Amino acid sequence: MGRFEGKVAVVTGAGAGIGKACALAIAREGGRVVVADIDGSAAIACTAQIAAEAGHALALAIDIADAQAVAALFETAERHFGGVDLLVNNASAMHLTPRDRAILELELAVWDQTMATNLRGTLLCCRQAIPRMIARGGGAIVNMSSCQGLSGDTALTSYAASKAAMNMLSSSLATQYGHAQIRCNAVAPGLIMTERLLAKLDACMQTHLRRHQLLPRVGRPEDVAALVAFLLSDDAAFITGQVVCIDGGMLAHVPTYADGGNSRAARPAGETAEADAAPRC
């Protein structure tokens, strides 16, 4: 018997990447899944894959920054599946990241739109899920944060700020509704090779980022989905209010770890020690 038999999950941003991996993981363990994504065709494709594996899912196209649309999403989930037990807030305004620059170069419209989706959208989904979870005796929420929300960068100002705020939103929710048997945790992925990221990062940048990991491979969406499934399940029944990094050790080391002069720095598979003396990308 799967860990999510009899449970209903809403997963936003579930049409591709980490969100899709989460939806599949929940369905494979018996959960019924509402696959929500702004790209309706991607949501339908994910639902079709779940159905092909004998799972149960419903596809819905939604912009989570729209309060009325979010309310309709949860009403539909309740009408179709009888309630909501689990929520994965994964949707994020990733299409804005190329314009998400340093503070003085940042367009305010990018800041506003990023916050509207990443933070307001997460809040709206939580506000719809919490009463329904209370009605069913409790539930579990995972908010998809990022390592970007834990350390500064030369760009991605809006994205990082939204994810840092999401971490505190998760702690606040856990504090305010723990008495109602609702758990909430945030997951902070590092370098996870989704199709979108593979298309955006050239080989030089991938090599640079991998030097800052302690494990000799990049992360996969399935790695994150396994952590999310654990946090949603009864296996994590006493875990709440936490921000859990899944980054291959990217934030665990001293800043000089990946410097060329550090002979102990991790190297991509097949790379020799002589590469330490080569110019960096």
From Swiss-Prot:
Coiled coil: none
InterPro entries (alphabetical): NAD(P)-bd_dom_sf (IPR036291), Sc_DH/Rdtase_CS (IPR020904), SDR_fam (IPR002347)
Keywords: Oxidoreductase
Keyword Oxidoreductase: yes
Region (Disordered) residue spans: 261-281
One GO MF term: oxidoreductase activity
Key word Lyase present: no
Protein name, per record: Probable short-chain type dehydrogenase/reductase blr2146
Organism: Bradyrhizobium diazoefficiens (strain JCM 10833 / BCRC 13528 / IAM 13628 / NBRC 14792 / USDA 110)
